[in-house]
From Swiss-Prot:
Tissue expression from the record: Mammary gland specific. Secreted in milk.
Annotated protein name in UniProt: Alpha-S1-casein
Modified positions (Phosphoserine) in chain numbering: S56, S61, S63, S79, S81, S82, S83, S90, S130
Domain of life, per lineage: Eukaryota
Gene: CSN1S1
Length: 214
């Protein structure tokens, strides 16, 4: 009789679902104790201490497996959300880097302006002498910005660009217009007067000469 009861209980224990139903509001430890009481309390003579320990270990291992599966699912969800946040941040950094780096076209205008200043064009006397130093520093800044992303625009460059190109556009629409201006320091020569022009010299016997008739 005892063997029959034992086999029935073992069959029931093996037939129970691997994922037990979790009652809301009760912790896992309380549920494990209730299961042990349900199987052990009606038959205290059949189950000894060893059986009770084995059953408690089995139930504890199942609960730990469930918790591990839940932890893995949470970690996967967090990794997906973090990867989605990293992608827009990288796109924003590239967009800021493209906006902050000064264009090479402006540097070409600045070099052209400094070349025109060497010819002493009157409209370019306002350009400061430190423009060459600033051009050199701007070039170094661009090389540094290409290696490392730039967070903000340099205030000195932001102030220097509009002033410089406002003076540059006061010239003609193209740089060759500067050649129409007369450089400073040129000496003008006076035009000869009409009194200094020598009179034409003719022969004295021009009135007496006769033209041959054909």
């Amino acid at each position: 009789m005892k063997l029959l009861i034992l086999t029935c209980l073992v069959a029931v224990a093996l037939a129970r679902p691997k994922h037990p139903i979790k009652h809301q509001g009760l912790p896992q430890e309380v549920l494990n104790e209730n299961l042990l009481r349900f199987f052990v309390a009606p038959f205290p003579e059949v189950f000894g201490k060893e059986k009770v320990n084995e059953l408690s270990k089995d139930i504890g291992s199942e609960s730990t497996e469930d918790q591990a599966m839940e932890d893995i699912k949470q970690m996967e969800a967090e990794s997906i959300s973090s990867s989605e946040e990293i992608v827009p941040n990288s796109v924003e950094q590239k967009h800021i880097q493209k906006e902050d780096v000064p264009s090479e076209r402006y540097l070409g205008y600045l070099e052209q302006l400094l070349r025109l200043k060497k010819y002493k064009v009157p409209q370019l006397e306002i350009v400061p002498n430190s423009a060459e130093e600033r051009l050199h520093s701007m070039k170094e800044g661009i090389h540094a910005q290409q290696k490392e992303p730039m967070i903000g625009v340099n205030q000195e460059l932001a102030y220097f660009y509009p002033e410089l190109f406002r003076q540059f556009y006061q010239l003609d629409a193209y740089p060759s217009g500067a050649w129409y201006y007369v450089p400073l320091g040129t000496q003008y020569t006076d035009a000869p007067s009409f009194s200094d022009i020598p009179n034409p010299i003719g022969s004295e016997n021009s009135e007496k000469t006769t033209m041959p008739l054909w």
